[in-house]
UniProtKB/Swiss-Prot annotation:
GO cellular component: cytoplasm
Keyword ATP-binding tagged: yes
Protein name: UDP-N-acetylmuramoylalanine--D-glutamate ligase
Signal peptide location: none
Gene designation per UniProt: murD
Domain of life according to the entry: Bacteria
Keyword rRNA-binding on entry: no
Amino acid sequence: MRLVYGLGRSGLGVLRFLRKRGLPARFYDDRPREEEVREALALGFQPDWNLEEAYEEVVAAPGVPLDHPHLKRLAARGAKVLGEAELAYRLSPTPIVGITGTAGKTSTTLFTAHLLRAHGLRAREGGNVDPPLVSVVDEAEVAVAELSSFQLERVHAFRPRVAVLLNLGVDHLDRHGTVEAYHAAKLNLLKNLTPEDALVYNRLDPKVRRAAEASPARLYPFTPGSTPRETNLRAALEATRAYLDLLGRPLDPGAVAEALRTLPEAPHRFQAFARKGGVVFIDDSIATRTEAVRAALEAAPAPIAWILGGEDKGADLAPLLPLLGRVRVALALGRDGPRFARALEGRTEVVVIAEKDGRTAMRKAVEEALSRLEQGSVLLAPLAASFDQFRDYKDRAQAFREAVFALGGEPWTPSSS
C-alpha cells in the first residue's frame, strides 16, 4: 500500500495518476484544505489521519523535508520515501528530459518543450513548473521535467534519457544544511545515466563540468550567453539536439527559427500584471535568491513597496542594501518576516505583517503598500520559500494577484499601455 503524503497540486496529481492505473493508496496532509480533501475523496481514496497503517511506499510532496518526524517514523517502519518524479518514471514508459540547476530551470524547461514541439513531437513540460510531472507523462510523447533539489533528493531509480545540468550555486541551505548536501541532491539527476543517455551541461561551471566528465552519458556541453535568457536558450537547444539525436533525427534550423519567434515566458518571473492609478503590480514570486531579488529591485519602477518574507533559505541581504533607496516601504510577512525586518530597519520603512494566514497576510501587505504609494510599483520578490504560509510559490503568487484585484487593481501589462 502507498501513502500520498501532502495534497496540493503534487499530491492530487499523484492520486489522479494512481487512480488511472487502478492502484490503491491512502492520503495524509498536516494542513489539509477542505476542497483538496473533497477532491481526494471523490477520486476514491481515503485518508489515514493517524498514520497508523504500514506502507511499502510513501510518495511525499516536495515541500515535506526528508527529516520530517512523520517521514522518519514511516521510513523506520519499512516505507520507502520517494517523490512524484520517481513514481512517474517507474509507472510510465514516457521518456523524460530532466532539467535542474540553481538558476534558469523554469525557462530552460519551457524553451526545451517548445523547441521539441516545433520539431513535431508531442512534448509536455511539468514537474516543478506546472503541472506536476505525473500529470503530463501519460499525455506526452516526451516529458520535459523541471526538477528541484527537493524533488531530486527523493529519487532512487529515476533515469532521464536527457539530463540537463545548468549550474550549481548556493540555495536552500535552510533545507539541505550545507552547500555540499544541496549539490548532492542536484547531482542525483545524473546518478543513473548510462552510455545510452545524454547529458547537457554548462562547460564554464567547474563543479558542473567535473560531474559531467565523470558521467558515462554522451556529453553535450553548452557555453553560457551574455544574459540569463540567452544561456537558457542555448541549454534548451542542446537538450533538443540531444533528444533528437536519440531518435536519429537532426535539429531542423527552420523549425528552430520559427520556434524562436514564439518563445514562452516563465510565469511569476517579474510579471507586471495589474495597475491601479500610477501604481504597477509586479509578480516575481519565483525570486527567492539574492541575485534574482537584486535584479527585480533594480528593474521595478520606483518608489517600490517591496513584499518579502516566508521561510528564509539563508539569504544574504548585503547586496540588496544599496538598492533600498528605491524602496519606499518593505512589507515583511511569513515565518521569518521579523528577521528580515530587523535586517532592513533604519535603511527604509519596514512593516511587519503579523497575520499567520497567508492570504490574509498578503492582502494586508497590499493594503499597506497602496496606503503609501501614488505611483511606482508594488513588487512581490520574497527572497524566501513559501511553504510556511502557502503550498508553493505559485500559490503565493495567486494570493498576491487575488489581493491586488480585490483591492481595485485592474489587469494590465506593459504591452497594453
